[in-house]
UniProtKB/Swiss-Prot annotation:
Location of the active site: H676 (charge relay system), D726 (charge relay system), S825 (charge relay system)
Site (Reactive bond homolog): R630, I631
Source species of the chain: Macaca mulatta
Protein name: Neurotrypsin
Domain of life: Eukaryota
Length: 875
């Protein structure tokens, strides 16, 4: 993060999200040690606070735009003519929040029609197709990346920035059940409340509709006194009651002061509990427009069996939920298996009913199904780029049509191939397809939108294929593309293979292997995963060099389903699909076993002297720290991103030493760590080794090297019964300046200046290590952003135990606490200097407890020991 973005995030109140964990990550980091700590005082620890932090400023006002008109039932495409565009939602936010109109750092988006023709900085590709549209909602024009928008910067210039798709999300907290509670909204990277001034049932109804808890809401109020430290974002919310999202309502940005009656907005979502309109919801989808159908009956939620489930049934579900667009039925627990009872079976709607209760069906609770047959629906909004097959006997066949600028249009068949058909059918949720004669279906009278389409077969969406500009063609409707799609045979094997991608690697040639099957990206289990399997993956991706397999979630754990297990390639197959012998979806794995590959692998290990001259004179240099997707605040670090991070390991008789403490590489032969790391096992050099270049503790890597210890120097003032002077130096075995071999993954950290005050000079601070994540010991190097705290703050909490040779750091906000528990004892607290060099300002030392409220972690202040370090190491 640049200094400018850091300051901007601070001003907008987003700092807790920038420098800390979110609530999920906070659950995954609690302890510092990878193994049980030695006897003695526990470290680090926490204390409660009695000081209220200043309230963060709310985000700037959001521009208002009229809500798009809701389609009436008569205007809705009939289920037999409608297709489906699978997840993620085209062009918009993957979370389904289509109305986000502010960047992730709080800048209001410009309307796409207001963007000038000349820009100082090139935006992502394909944005020109949005030029002229009068809305300002965040979009991903190519359909593959993260949504973004243009905004006006402080200099009056137009720039672009990514959007946070969670902005405008709502939740109910503190109620007796899921249908009631205080309204909390997500903005500027954190959850906040709404002042209850002018809060009425129309506002409450929009909240209930957005949460899929029915269309009727009752406005309530909650005292702020019981909510803890949480900001107020909005006041005077003024909804009509039919908006799809609270972002579309008029409202005022909270400017501080006192909220009338000191009450926060709350709601109770009320359903009509008569027989005509049972309570329904969609669960397990990637947006509010899709998911497993669940009904609330007799006091509990249950599912619907998919026997005879079709698009007509889906049409009724979408109508009952108030969702317009294209309705499609999904079978065989496509959105995951539910729990609880199966409520209904044999549902047979005509598509014209107002409620599923009006459809012919089994009696409540009567069925012959399991949850593997749970029914689902998708209600795809009509946005530009949605496709369908129209004019056939069902949604699986017909004339290919694309929705653009409020109108359905066709596609010309010039240059149409089998690969094009495959991409269309896959996007619509089918396994196979073939081009059909246009004479089989009624001729269109609308526009011809696309021509000269060419797909490679790897695309996940039809609009990712190359094509002419919208409306440019030399065709007539006699040349309209028509397609018939088929679900495929048992086992879901594909004749053409399926798309493969590599995720979270350092470059495009390596990463976690993900495959696109059944409309979803998923991973491969590493059972039996070998270099032969990796060779096939790399060949399918177009790489011809040597390939190496990586196991045990080497590139991080994926999300979504695990599609494939027990891959058995010979190494000569043309695609992964030719290697699969086991049915898709069958496995006995977790995401901790996700498979990965490195393509064009030629062995990157540097020799001992090859780069000595170029690297021995530098420090604090991160050669591998940027990637498109930032991973901060307690997640896996980028491999090689912290090249000075090393581990002090305890040797065993078996030769497989375990991790004891973290440490920091200061030069080729010297390592900095904590003195207490040697308290239990003594300071005999025979007991220890130091590992450099490590990332995944269980996978041997090309830059990894384990070096013996020649000398251990503990500060002479350190006492085992005290936490002061908790610092030590370790001399590695080897000739002078030739102990550890430098490379892009092994480099020394800089030392701070003597008596430097890091609270004034340092910024952008991180802790790193392989510490206990709270659920299991981390296999991969972790990192967490962490703020330095004022000296007086630490002295008040630790009284006389905190000395001038110590620092304390941590995020003390509730649910976002971060301290040295997230690193290893002896590990580094690194801060960025001006000019992008990094210095070690702290050594993880002690604290009160772990994750305890208002008790920051304590670190040995390295700047206080610079003369001692230099006298020992001769640096």
């Amino acid at each position: 993060m640049t200094l400018a973005r850091f300051v901007l995030a601070l001003v907008l109140g987003a700092l807790p999200e920038v420098v800390g964990f979110d609530s999920v990550l906070n659950d995954s980091f609690h302890h510092r040690h990878r193994h049980s700590p030695p006897p003695g005082p526990q470290y680090p620890y926490y204390l409660p606070t009695h000081q209220r932090p200043p309230r963060t400023r709310p985000p700037p006002p959001l521009p208002r735009f009229p809500r798009p008109p809701r389609a009436l039932p008569a205007q809705r495409p009939h289920a037999l003519q409608a297709g489906h565009t699978p997840r993620p939602h085209p062009w918009g936010c993957p979370a389904g929040e289509l109305w986000v109109s502010v960047t992730d750092f709080g800048a209001p988006c410009l309307r796409w029609a207001e963007v000038p023709p000349f820009l100082e900085r090139s935006p992502p590709a394909n944005w020109a197709q949005l030029r002229g549209q009068r809305h300002n909602f965040c979009r991903s024009p190519d359909g593959t990346g993260r949504p973004w928008c243009f905004y006006g910067d402080a200099r009056g210039k137009v720039d672009w920035g990514y959007c946070d798709c969670r902005h405008g999300s709502v939740r109910l907290r503190g109620g007796k059940n899921e249908f009631e509670g205080t309204v909390e909204v997500y903005a500027s990277g954190a959850w906040g409340t709404v002042c209850s001034s002018h809060w009425d049932d129309s506002d409450a109804s929009v909240i209930c509709h957005q949460l899929q808890l029915g269309g009727k809401g009752i406005a309530k109020q909650t005292p702020f006194s019981g909510l803890g430290l949480i900001p107020i974002y909005w006041s005077n919310v003024r909804c009509r009651g039919d908006e799809e999202n609270i972002l579309l309502c008029e409202k005022d940005i909270w400017q501080g002061g006192v909220c009338p009656q000191k009450m926060a907005a709350a709601v109770t979502c009320s359903f009509s509990r008569g027989p005509a309109f049972p309570i329904i919801r969609l669960v397990g989808g990637s947006s509010v427009h899709e998911g497993r159908v669940e009904l609330y009956h007799a006091g509990q939620w249950g599912t619907i069996c998919d026997d005879q489930w079709d698009d007509a049934d889906a049409e009724v579900i979408c109508r009952q939920l108030g969702l317009s667009g294209i309705a499609k039925a999904w079978h065989q627990a496509y959105f995951g298996e539910g729990s609880g009872p199966v409520m209904l079976d044999e549902v047979r709607c005509t598509g014209n009913e107002l409620s599923i209760e009006q459809c012919p069906k089994s009696s409540w609770g009567e069925h012959n199904c399991g949850h593997k047959e749970d029914a689902g629906v998708s209600c795809t909004p009509l946005t530009d780029g949605v496709i369908r097959l129209a004019g056939g006997k069902g949604s699986h066949e017909g004339r290919l049509e694309v929705y653009y600028r409020g109108q359905w249009g066709t596609v010309c068949d010039d240059g149409w191939t089998e690969l094009n058909t495959y991409v269309v059918c896959r996007q619509l949720g089918f396994k196979y397809g073939k081009q059909a004669s246009a004479n089989h279906f009624e001729e269109s009278t609308g526009p011809i939108w696309l021509d000269d389409v060419s797909c490679s077969g790897k695309e996940t969406r039809f609009l990712q294929c190359s094509r002419r500009q919208w409306g440019q063609h030399d065709c007539s409707h006699h040349e309209d593309v028509s397609i018939a799609c088929y679900p495929g045979s048992e086992g879901h094997r594909l004749s053409l293979g399926f798309p493969v991608r590599l995720m979270d690697g350092e470059n495009k040639k390596e990463g976690r292997v993900e495959v696109f099957i059944n409309g979803q990206w998923g991973t491969i289990c590493d059972d039996g995963w070998t270099d032969k399997d990796a060779a096939v993956i790399c060949r399918q991706l177009g790489y011809k060099g040597p390939a190496r397999a990586r196991t045990m979630a080497y590139f991080g754990e994926g999300k979504g389903p695990i599609h494939v297990d027990n891959v058995k390639c010979t190494g000569n197959e043309r695609s992964l699909a030719d290697c699969i012998k086991q049915d898709i979806g069958r496995h006995n794995c977790r995401h901790s076993e996700d498979a990965g590959v490195i393509c064009d692998y030629f062995g990157k290990k540097a020799s001992g002297n090859s780069n000595k001259e170029s690297l021995s004179s530098v420090c604090g240099l991160r050669l591998l720290h940027r990637r498109q997707k930032r991973i901060i605040g307690g997640k896996n670090s980028l491999r090689g991103g912290w090249p000075w991070q090393v581990s002090l390991r305890l040797k065993s008789s078996h030769g497989d030493g375990r991790l004891l403490c973290g440490a920091t590489l200061l030069s080729s032969c010297w390592v900095l760590t904590a003195a207490h790391c040697f308290k239990r096992y003594g300071n005999s050099t025979r007991n220890y080794a130091v590992r450099v270049g490590d990332y995944h503790t269980l996978v041997p890597e090309e830059f990894e090297e384990e070096i013996g210890v020649q000398q251990i120097v503990i500060h002479r003032e350190y006492r085992p019964d005290s936490s002061d002077y908790d610092i030590a130096l370790v001399r590695l075995q080897g000739p002078e300046e030739q102990c550890a071999r430098f490379s892009s993954h092994v480099l020394p950290a800089c030392l701070p200046f003597w008596r430097e005050r890091p609270q004034k000079t340092a910024s952008n601070c991180y802790i790193t290590g392989w510490g206990d994540t709270g659920r299991a010991y981390s296999r991969t190097l972790q990192q967490a952003a962490i703020p330095l705290l004022p000296k007086r703050f630490c002295e008040e909490r630790y009284k006389g135990r905190f000395t001038g040779r110590m620092l304390c750091a941590g995020n003390l906000h509730e649910h976002k606490r971060v301290d040295s528990c997230q690193g290893d004892s002896g590990g580094p607290l690194m801060c960025e200097r001006p000019g992008e060099s990094w210095a070690v300002y702290g050594v993880t030392s002690w604290g009160y407890g772990c994750g305890v409220k208002d008790s920051p972690g304590v670190y040995t202040k390295v700047s206080a020991f610079v003369p001692w370090i230099k006298s020992v190491t001769k640096l």
